Design a protein with these regions (language model features):
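Accessory low-complexity/Zn-finger-associated flanking regions
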Residues: 2-81, 92-93, 98-99, 114-292, ...
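Catalytic cores of histone-lysine modification enzymes
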Residues: 11-14, 18-50, 54, 222-257, ...
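Aromatic/acidic cage segments in peptide-binding pockets
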Residues: 86-96, 102-128, 280, 315-335, ...
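Conserved SET/PR-domain catalytic core that frames the SAM/AdoMet-binding pocket
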Residues: 91-92, 97-101, 106-108, 286-323, ...
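Acidic, Ser/Thr-rich intrinsically disordered and amphipathic helical segments
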Residues: 104-112, 195, 199, 205-207, ...
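Generic preference for well-ordered alpha-helical elements
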Residues: 106-109, 122, 127, 193, ...
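C-terminal folded domains that constitute the principal catalytic or ligand-binding module
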Residues: 407-409, 413-416, 421-457
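C-terminal interaction modules of eukaryotic adaptor/scaffold proteins
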Residues: 445-479
Length: 479
């Protein structure tokens, strides 16, 4: 006998303006062929480029419903509280579309979004058991010193909160894309591009998806090697590799190649366009007692979700040697891939392989290891003569001191909640990846966003920086 199913509407509990989810009796499905008309009315007021709420509640504002399902065998059921803390392994969630169709998987929802030409993308839908779909945390408005540090350049507003004093962050130019005064060649004629019409859902036929997959195979990605030992086909492997429903849980150290400006696929709905479509999480810049400025999230973020990219001015090592060393990140994807050709590659974990990005942050003012070498070795006195960007051995650096995005405020933690992924969009040059940050676990509302600076303690004589992360596995020192 089939299992009984009990549906419980899931309501949110936080804030004075909770998300409205209507009762189960409304929106009953009537048999029809789904088309853009199914979402036209529900989405008429939805503006994808202006997000003012928890992004994972956006479907509710566009006519979607969300239900807690309990399945019980032996023809009986028992009602459970609709809270994520009590969900058992036999529970699930059900999304109901504006036209009344019910979906149990994100694959089904993704197909529906394509079929209806919806403004929503799959990244706004959640299928894990721990992410709470609640309105954003509200902090005391009297301590908000500035409404939006991005000055309208992001899809979201990021307020500045300081309950310790009236100080604001040091001034800088906010930008969402890396910029540079350098002149270097970017041969786009050799870039992979696609002409997909299915939002690039058929990965085995999308050249961009295949580029990511083939590069990973070429560099002996551990995940792919394991699948090959299980005799999985390329088609079976590629559908479970890299972005899954626009989330990245396992980093791809050989790089991810997103669809680009030459591709004919949809610029917003494409399943292989994520990092390029900007920040969509609700964040707040706040002042701490021990670490200066920090960044926290105002709602739960599911594991694998994209946060944003590290943005700055692109400079050479020689130029960096003359700069005030703050907010630096080294782009070293090319030498990283070269290093993986040694025979010890397979002994390294995926996480360790990704730790090729070193940063110099905020008040620390400490040059990273690569920059120390450039300080000692460079003989060039004129920054204008540093036009060696075409040198295959050159290394480039992002400087976010005077120009950057909100990511310039990320602090260090020995137990980080974000990981780094090198992504290639409008350049396939291995020296110019986009440094993207993804949630490496579920992040709770109010939690500070941190990454691991990965400094080597003792690499700088006579310099000691104690760690302030207070994590259970804290290493005690940054340097």
């Amino acid at each position: 006998m089939a299992d009984s199913i009990f549906l419980t509407p899931v309501f949110v509990s936080r804030s004075s303006s909770p998300v409205s989810i209507r009762s189960f009796s409304s929106n009953v499905h009537q048999s029809h062929q789904c088309s853009p008309h199914c979402v036209l009315t529900a989405e008429e007021n939805f503006i994808p480029d202006c997000i003012i709420q928890n992004p994972y509640t956006l479907p509710f504002s566009c006519g979607w419903k969300y239900f807690h399902i309990d399945r019980y065998a032996k023809d009986r059921f028992k009602k459970k509280p609709s809270t994520r803390k009590t969900i058992s392994s036999r529970s699930n969630y059900l999304y109901r579309s504006p036209c009344g169709r019910s979906f149990l998987t994100l694959d089904e929802i993704e197909q529906y979004l394509l079929q209806t030409n919806s403004k929503l993308t799959i990244k706004f839908f959640v299928d894990d058991r721990t992410t709470r779909l609640e309105s954003c945390i509200k902090y005391e408005s009297k301590y908000i010193l500035y409404d939006d540090i991005t000055q309208g350049k992001e899809y979201v507003r990021i307020p500045v909160y300081n309950e310790n004093n009236s100080n604001l962050p040091e001034s800088f130019i906010y930008g969402t894309e890396t910029r540079s005064k350098l002149i270097f060649s970017n041969d786009t004629t050799t870039m992979t591009c696609c002409s997909c019409t299915d939002n690039c859902r058929n990965r085995i036929k999308c050249p961009c998806w295949l580029k990511t997959f083939e590069q990973a195979k070429l560099n002996e990605n551990e995940q792919i090697l394991n699948w090959q030992r299980q005799n999985l086909s390329d088609e079976q492997m590629i559908i479970r590799f890299a972005y899954i429903h626009q989330r990245l849980k396992i980093p791809v150290w050989s790089g991810i190649y997103e669809c680009n400006s030459k591709c004919l696929c949809h610029t917003k709905q494409c399943t292989n366009r994520l990092v390029q479509n900007s920040l969509y999480q609700q964040l707040q810049l706040f002042h701490t007692n021990t670490k200066g400025w920090a960044l926290r999230v105002l709602h739960d973020i599911p594991y694998g979700s994209f946060i944003n990219a590290y943005v700055g001015e692109l400079i050479t090592e020689q130029m960096a040697a003359k700069r005030d060393f703050k907010y630096l990140a080294i782009l070293d994807h090319k030498s990283h891939l070269t290093a993986t050709n040694n025979k010890n590659r397979k002994e390294s974990s995926i996480k360790n392989k990704l730790d090729d990005v070193r940063i110099l942050h905020a008040k620390n003012r400490i040059p990273v290891k690569c920059c120390i070498r450039s300080l000692n070795d460079t003989q060039t006195d004129n920054e204008d003569d540093d036009n060696d960007e075409d040198d295959d051995d050159s290394c480039f650096i992002l400087d976010a001191k005077h120009y950057g995005s909100i990511s310039r405020f990320y602090n260090h933690s020995c137990k980080p909640n974000v990981h780094i992924q090198n992504v290639f969009i409008n350049s396939h040059n291995p020296r110019f990846p986009v440094i993207a940050l993804f949630a490496c676990r579920n992040i709770r509302a109010g939690e500070e966003i941190c990454w691991d600076y990965n400094y080597s303690v003792g690499c700088m004589p006579n310099v000691r920086i104690d760690c302030q992360c207070q994590a259970s596995n804290c290493r005690g020192r940054l340097l």
